[in-house]
């Protein structure tokens, strides 16, 4: 299955106007973690918060809805959230922890839960793992190349970034700039080339924009707990949803991109094996 094991797939968006303004797409990550926090399902969440440099995120422990909102929006460079999990449990004393992760981080967290040596009494505290779709991730220096060198902008002027329709989008207060995705090839993290997971197949809930209209997100529930929390949030009016079959561009595009990432990774893994280089699979 190109999308992994799942319970249900819907198109959804937050009903909170403030979250809608802050979020990348439908506000699912922020809204779901905030709901779980308010309901006592979790006591805090590890998220990618703002860093000392513009658009260079740093992992943070969010204990309130306002802190979650401060971390809203996608950052296209790496935030080492997994490193913050131990601190969240041992220094903040969190017994029920939520976190957001890209697919490779999701895999690492599940491995820690399966083989908890070195993170004993930490992995079992994770009660909600929200995964976000990811085709590739860029080093911060690559973002600087795209924005500062190729587009001629200062990082501090950027209000939002996005990837879609074959382009890398950069939004400022006054204008919108685009860069063909082909010009970003070769700048991604090296590990992205051998990663097979586009849709965070091991998360409790996976989400991203692909497959849904602008302002909405495609949400995949994968575990009993993830499915239950999302349904509770919908019943509480936190999200509005539509059947994925009734929206455009629809599930076909998500399946296509997921399959493409798997195929590309398989080819790169085979090439590495031929050269005698290590592979993760």
Curated annotation (Swiss-Prot):
It catalyses: oxidized coenzyme F420-(gamma-L-Glu)(n) + H2 + H(+) = reduced coenzyme F420-(gamma-L-Glu)(n). Transmembrane segments: none annotated. InterPro entries: Co_F420_Hydgase/DH_bsu_N, FRHB/FDHB/HCAR-like, FrhB_archaea, FrhB_FdhB_C. Its EC number is 1.12.98.1. Keywords: Iron, Iron-sulfur, Metal-binding, Oxidoreductase. One of its GO terms (molecular function) is flavin adenine dinucleotide binding. It comes from the Archaea. Its cofactor is Ni(2+); iron-sulfur cluster; FAD. There are 12-13 Fe atoms per alpha/beta/gamma unit of the FRH. NCBIfam families: frhB, PRK09325.1. Heterocomplex of the form (alpha(1)beta(1)gamma(1))(8). Reduces the physiological low-potential two-electron acceptor coenzyme F420, and the artificial one-electron acceptor methylviologen. Belongs to the FrhB family. This is Coenzyme F420 hydrogenase subunit beta. It comes from Methanothermobacter thermautotrophicus (strain ATCC 29096 / DSM 1053 / JCM 10044 / NBRC 100330 / Delta H) (Methanobacterium thermoautotrophicum). The gene is frhB.
């Amino acid at each position: 299955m190109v999308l992994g094991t799942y319970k249900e797939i819907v198109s959804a968006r937050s009903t909170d106007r403030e979250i809608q303004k802050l979020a990348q797409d439908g506000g699912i990550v922020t809204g779901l973690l905030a709901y779980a926090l308010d309901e006592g399902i979790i006591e805090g969440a590890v998220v990618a918060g703002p860093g000392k440099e513009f658009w260079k995120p740093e992992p943070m422990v969010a204990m309130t809805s306002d802190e979650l909102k401060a971390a809203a929006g996608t950052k296209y460079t790496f935030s080492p959230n997994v490193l913050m999990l131990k601190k969240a449990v041992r220094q903040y004393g969190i017994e029920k922890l939520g976190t957001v992760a890209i697919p490779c981080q999701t895999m690492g967290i599940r491995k820690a839960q399966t083989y908890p040596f070195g993170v004993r009494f930490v992995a079992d505290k994770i009660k909600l793992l929200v995964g976000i779709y990811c085709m590739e991730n860029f080093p911060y220096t690559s973002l600087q190349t795209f924005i500062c060198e190729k587009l001629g902008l200062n990082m501090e002027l950027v209000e939002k970034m996005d990837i879609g329709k074959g382009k890398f989008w950069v939004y400022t207060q006054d204008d919108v700039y685009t860069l063909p995705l082909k010009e970003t090839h070769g700048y991604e993290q090296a590990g992205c080339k051998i990663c097979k997971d586009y849709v965070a197949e091991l998360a409790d809930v996976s989400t991203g924009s692909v497959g849904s209209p602008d302002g909405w997100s495609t949400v995949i529930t994968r575990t009993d707990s993830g499915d239950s929390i999302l349904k509770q949030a919908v019943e509480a009016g936190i999200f509005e949803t539509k059947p994925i079959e009734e929206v455009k561009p629809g599930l076909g595009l998500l399946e296509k991109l997921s399959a493409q990432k798997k195929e590309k990774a398989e080819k790169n893994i085979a090439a590495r094996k031929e050269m005698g280089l290590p592979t993760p699979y």
